């Protein structure tokens, strides 16, 4: 199983879900979104604990995960978003190291250019590409995860 994860680009006023996609050995592709926004009355680290629990659940339910590819965001809308991204990146890469799973970040422009032919594609463009491939993404985060999956499946790394 190859796992493709988008690290959340959450911001306090507008939290976004994490898009994900899995390519199973039998060729089955599953995808979706997951929310890790801080809940009321929670400490700041709870979102990361939920993230790690979710990673472990995916690993357990999908069998062996042989690679993780994630969206490498180089610009953030603000300090809070940068801190959240750094926290998720730290936990994701440590989790991969702990389980001896290779991982690679993929720049946003690379994902968009591979999917649409232009590195500055809009969210709607990314959703349209996913739909053209036969998927029904909930939002652009899931569409981006599917784009990363296809980038990796086509050996672009």
Where are the model-predicted features located?
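Phosphate- and other anionic-substrate recognition elements at nucleic-acid/protein interfaces
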Residues: 1-157
């Amino acid at each position: 199983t190859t796992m493709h994860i988008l690290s959340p680009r959450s911001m306090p006023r507008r939290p976004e879900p994490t898009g994900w996609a899995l390519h199973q050995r039998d060729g089955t592709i599953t995808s979706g979104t997951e929310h890790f926004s801080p809940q009321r009355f929670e400490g700041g680290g709870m979102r990361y604990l939920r993230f790690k629990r979710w990673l472990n659940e995916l690993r357990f339910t999908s069998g062996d995960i042989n690679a993780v590819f994630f969206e490498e965001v180089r610009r953030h809308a603000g300090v809070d978003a940068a801190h959240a991204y750094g926290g998720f990146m730290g936990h994701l890469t440590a989790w991969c190291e702990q389980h001896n799973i290779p991982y690679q970040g993929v720049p946003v422009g690379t994902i968009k250019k591979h999917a649409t032919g232009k590195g500055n594609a809009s969210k709607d463009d990314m959703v349209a590409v996913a739909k053209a491939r036969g998927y029904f993404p909930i939002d652009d985060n899931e569409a981006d995860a599917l784009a990363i999956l296809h980038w990796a499946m086509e050996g672009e790394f």
